[in-house]
Amino acid sequence: MSRYRGPRFKKIRRLGSLPGLTSKRPTVKSELRNQSRSSKKSQYRIRLEEKQKLRFHYGLTERQLLKYVRIAGKAKGSTGQVLLQLLEMRLDNILFRLGMAATIPQARQLINHRHVLVNGHIVDIPSYRCKPQDIITAKDEQKSKTLIQNYLDSAPREKLPNHLTLHPFQYKGLINQIIDNKWVGLKINELLVVEYYSRQT
């Protein structure tokens, strides 16, 4: 299954706020409608929608998300928490959380077009797994800096999570540590996502 490129508002109207996909927010009316429907949903539907929220927020294909679930399942600790850490430490998400891109698709575009450096080296793989002490910078070219400056100026001013530090005038971000799950940028019940996949096998 390919990455979603359809109408974004349609998705947030059904699944709720997906800040990684779009900065738009669902209307109060659609949120109330979703709440009234939630009591009528089957357990399968509830798990499916949590999985879809995760997939669309981080901009993943079905195959990519399944791969992350399998990696998380083999790691020590809670599978759901490890899954969220893996997704949050992707380079495209780090760029988004730093405010150097307004959405994850925008971050992915910057990375694909080679505007982003990690520890002084160009990285053009959005799924690159960042680690503590990594330094994320704009390429030392005017076009790269202008693009990122525009995003820094236009991105909504969210409180920066504790695991990140931003130096906007240097076009630089620092990863201080692995993310604490309370700072995950999406309201999600990750256990339902793990349950969804465990019941598919």
Swiss-Prot record:
Single annotated GO MF: structural constituent of ribosome
Keyword Transmembrane: no
Keywords in alphabetical order: Chloroplast, Plastid, Ribonucleoprotein, Ribosomal protein, RNA-binding, rRNA-binding
Family indicated by similarity: Belongs to the universal ribosomal protein uS4 family.
Lineage of producing organism: Eukaryota, Viridiplantae, Streptophyta, Embryophyta, Tracheophyta
Subunit: Part of the 30S ribosomal subunit. Contacts protein S5. The interaction surface between S4 and S5 is involved in control of translational fidelity.
Alphabetized InterPro entries for the sequence: Ribosomal_uS4, Ribosomal_uS4_bac-type, Ribosomal_uS4_CS, Ribosomal_uS4_N, S4_RNA-bd, S4_RNA-bd_sf
Biological processes per GO annotation: ribosomal small subunit biogenesis; translation
CDD domains: S4 (cd00165)
GO cellular component, one term: chloroplast
The protein, known as: Small ribosomal subunit protein uS4c
Task performed by this protein: One of the primary rRNA binding proteins, it binds directly to 16S rRNA where it nucleates assembly of the body of the 30S subunit.
UniProt KW Ribosomal protein keyword: yes
Region (Disordered): 15-44
Record-annotated S4 RNA-binding domain positions: 89-151
Entry superkingdom: Eukaryota
Localization in the cell: Plastid, Chloroplast
Pfam families: Ribosomal_S4, S4
